[in-house]
Amino acid sequence: MAELATIARPYAEALFRVAEGGDIAAWSTLVQELAQVARLPEVLSVASSPKVTRTQVAELLLAAVKSPVAAGAEAKNFVQMLVDNHRIALLPEIAEQFEALKNEREGAADAEIVSAFPLNGADLDSLVSGLERKFKRKLKPTVEVDSSLIGGVRVTVGDEVLDTSVRARLASMQAALTA
């Protein structure tokens, strides 16, 4: 995985520099859509087929996305470069790194919230608001439910983890009692 990240980083950074000259959100949508298409085994199979030209593969990728940015010369050049260098499989990692650069520029971060119970809109908004104050940045939450937490939440923002779950507290108490 680290090797993929190392190879994908220059592509993501170059694409981000191009996106800074225009609409970063639209470019983000494009790269996310391309990543979804590149995850399809059928697309990877077609891309590696000797019967299909590289130009045809690039056209296939661009035809599969809805983003209006795909019609631009920069997007076409980017996709053609990936196809020519046999880097289509890197698109999911490029999308991840592009999103990280976008978040860094916006002063935002992705927050993975794991809750013992489903969170409704008001509860989630209140939780995110409090977390934004704690982490001092805008958060983009994704929520999962894990009943094994028993109660509370576990929040991961980048490499920081805030675990207020009952399971974590019980583990802490067990460690203190057995020490």
Curated annotation (Swiss-Prot):
One of its GO terms (cellular component) is plasma membrane. It comes from the Bacteria. It is found in: Cell inner membrane. Keywords: ATP synthesis, Cell inner membrane, Cell membrane, CF(1), Hydrogen ion transport, Ion transport, Membrane, Transport. InterPro entries: ATP_synth_OSCP/delta_N_sf, ATPase_OSCP/dsu. The keyword Hydrolase does not apply. It holds the Pfam family OSCP. Gene3D superfamilies: N-terminal domain of the delta subunit of the F1F0-ATP synthase. Transmembrane segments: none annotated. The keyword Ion transport applies. Belongs to the ATPase delta chain family. This is ATP synthase subunit delta. It comes from Burkholderia cenocepacia (strain HI2424).
